[in-house]
Amino acid sequence: MHCPFCSATDTKVIDSRLVADGHQVRRRRECTECHERFTTFEGAELVMPRVIKRDGTRQPFDEEKLRGGMLRAVEKRPVSIDEIEQALTKIKSTLRATGEREVNSEMIGNLMMEQLMSLDKVAYIRFASVYRAFEDVSQFGEAIAKLQK
């Protein structure tokens, strides 16, 4: 790996350890030329299935869109970034585990709601109200009743 400081081509690994529940390797490296140290993260690049939207169009899976939806749902709620990242990892793992090349956006929305339900009930209601396009108070009541079961 090239040194980000001096662009030398030779660096050595000082320390390696697993992070993100074993899904990534964190490596501390040192440049043999300028002796600067830096950190790299290594993870498997796995192909995500394409998403079939409600209108039938297909698009590549967009992790940032998923993260943005979750962040909006948990905004100003007591949910840590680590919990959000773990939930996103579970959703992506479930999607990969289907073995399908394409998945419906509805499946992704349902997986998101499952994760939000276990993280924070208010965030779940927020997301469900937009995702399910609630139009009146009775639909909120039904969603809340589902949580209380």
Swiss-Prot record:
Record's keyword terms, sorted: ATP-binding, DNA-binding, Metal-binding, Nucleotide-binding, Repressor, Transcription, Transcription regulation, Zinc, Zinc-finger
One Pfam family in the UniProt entry: Zn_ribbon_NrdR
InterPro entries, alphabetized: ATP-cone_dom (IPR005144), NrdR-like_N (IPR055173), RNR_NrdR-like (IPR003796)
Transcription regulation in keyword set: yes
ATP-cone domain mapped to chain residues: 49-139
Record GO terms (molecular function): ATP binding; DNA binding; zinc ion binding
Any one Gene Ontology BP term: negative regulation of DNA-templated transcription
Ligase as UniProt keyword: no
Zinc finger unnamed: from-to: 3-34
Cofactor: Zn(2+)
Cofactor details (free text): Binds 1 zinc ion.
UniProt similarity note: Belongs to the NrdR family.
Primary role: Negatively regulates transcription of bacterial ribonucleotide reductase nrd genes and operons by binding to NrdR-boxes.
NCBIfam families: transcriptional regulator NrdR
Protein name in UniProt: Transcriptional repressor NrdR
Species name: Shewanella frigidimarina (strain NCIMB 400)
Gene that this sequence comes from: nrdR
